Amino acid sequence: MAEKRNIFLVGPMGAGKSTIGRHLAQMLHLEFHDSDQEIEQRTGADIAWVFDVEGEEGFRRREAQVIADLSEKQGIVLATGGGSVQSKDIRNHLSARGIVVYLETTIDKQVARTQRDKRRPLLQVDDPREVLENLAEIRNPLYEEIADVIVKTDDQSAKVVANQIIEKLGF
């Protein structure tokens, strides 16, 4: 890779953005960042606390700032939060500052991968499947809008998906 390009991973909760992102960064010798982890580091609190205290709006404000800051770096792999694409500013930053890879997965896989995870505030409801379906209806077209590459993550290891991304990007 001659120039240090950024790779931004977008997709729904449970698509594997963080896990695949770590593999991808390691394989390409790039720095890895996770926008949710960065928010937690900057606030000194976990995402659930930020949602409880500041609401989703407060969380989204913090997320927009973190992604704006991180996307200015060069040579990174960034795993974004599933809802970050709902911000036009974030979509513009990602599109302008790197390669956007949409990690696509089914609702069934999302449910299976997130069902025991208590760190996902939007899923702490009686019917998380319904929430995931509603979010997919809103967010999937936005992921597709900004994606340079789409890769399905169902039934594949993170390493296999990372290799597919590298192959599709021609690195």
Swiss-Prot record:
**Tree of life domain:** Bacteria
Q: Is Phosphoprotein tagged as a keyword?
A: no
Binding-site positions, ATP: 14-19, 120, 156
Keyword Kinase set for record: yes
Q: Which residues form a coiled coil?
A: none
Gene Ontology annotations for the cellular component aspect, listed alphabetically: cytosol
Task: Tell me which residues bind Mg(2+).
Answer: 18
Q: Which cofactors are named for this entry?
A: Mg(2+)
Q: Which Pfam families match?
A: SKI
Which residues participate in substrate binding?
Answer: 36, 60, 82, 139
CDD domains, per this entry? Answer: SK
The reaction(s) this protein catalyses: shikimate + ATP = 3-phosphoshikimate + ADP + H(+)
Q: In which pathway is this protein known to take part?
A: Metabolic intermediate biosynthesis; chorismate biosynthesis; chorismate from D-erythrose 4-phosphate and phosphoenolpyruvate: step 5/7
Alphabetically list the UniProt keywords.
Amino-acid biosynthesis, Aromatic amino acid biosynthesis, ATP-binding, Cytoplasm, Kinase, Magnesium, Metal-binding, Nucleotide-binding, Transferase
PROSITE patterns attached to this UniProt entry: SHIKIMATE_KINASE
Q: How is the cofactor bound?
A: Binds 1 Mg(2+) ion per subunit.
InterPro entries with a match to the protein in the record: P-loop_NTPase, Shikimate/glucono_kinase, Shikimate_kinase/TSH1, Shikimate_kinase_CS
Assembly with partners or alone:
Monomer.
Q: What does this protein do?
A: Catalyzes the specific phosphorylation of the 3-hydroxyl group of shikimic acid using ATP as a cosubstrate.
What family is it from?
Answer: Belongs to the shikimate kinase family.
Protein's UniProt name:
Shikimate kinase
Per UniProt, what is the name of the gene that codes for the protein in this document? aroK
